[in-house]
A protein has these predicted regions:
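Short, charged/small-residue-rich alpha-helical element at the C-terminal edge
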Residues: 32-171, 175-176
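Conserved catalytic segment of ABC-fold P-loop ATPases
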Residues: 1-8, 21-22
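Short glycine-/polar-rich loops that comprise or flank the Walker A/P-loop
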Residues: 4, 29-32
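Phosphate-coordinating loops and pocket residues in cytosolic domains that bind phosphorylated ligands
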Residues: 25
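ABC ATPase "signature
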Residues: 17-18
């Protein structure tokens, strides 16, 4: 016989029982927003690159980052293309830096927008080029309200596409058993 009920056990203790949806509603504390940014236009990239030489050394890049603390923080996140190029080559191509610079500006604007909707518990889970993933507190905004706001503001914020989903059972298991 098939069953629709699940249980989560850890160290011999049954921690929760219910259908997958019941467990997600009871223990899932966040929703996940995954989005793809609209690629930068050649005009926008050219405008940013006008003030740069074709390659920039680490000291020049670090001086530029000092002007915006959120960009400096983004530089130290895993898989930052600018940091990786500097570590491997000692310099970064202006085109790579310009594209990253503009992507970070869009991502930061989206993060601030989400915080205005759902509060300060909005968390950037990762960013990798055009792809960004945020965790949103479930209590901040209903799903229909969130979709309405995303639809109304996606063009202005430079989003090409997005998805919103509940926490996965694996994420819930990990949070319950920690």
């Amino acid at each position: 016989a098939l069953s629709s009920r699940l249980g989560i056990m850890a160290e011999g203790q049954l921690l929760t029982v219910g259908t997958a949806q019941q467990i997600k509603e009871k223990h899932g504390s966040s929703q996940e927003l995954v989005l793809r940014l609209r690629p930068e236009s050649e005009e926008a990239l050219s405008q940013v690159m006008r003030d740069m030489s074709s390659e920039l050394e680490a000291s020049s890049v670090m001086a530029m980052l000092e002007s915006t603390p959120w960009r400096r923080a983004a530089y130290y996140r895993p898989r930052c293309i600018v940091r990786l190029q500097l570590e491997q080559r000692g310099c970064v191509e202006a085109s790579v830096l310009a594209e990253w610079w503009l992507q970070q500006a869009k991502g930061h604007a989206i993060e601030e927008f989400l915080q205005s909707l759902a509060g300060d518990r909005v968390e950037l889970a990762e960013d990798f080029g055009l792809y960004w993933r945020f965790r949103l507190p479930r209590s901040g905004l209903s799903l229909p309200q969130l979709f309405q706001q995303l639809e109304e503001n996606s063009a202005r914020l430079g989003m090409d596409e997005y998805t919103v989903s509940q926490a996965t059972l694996e994420q819930i298991f990990n949070s319950i058993t920690e």
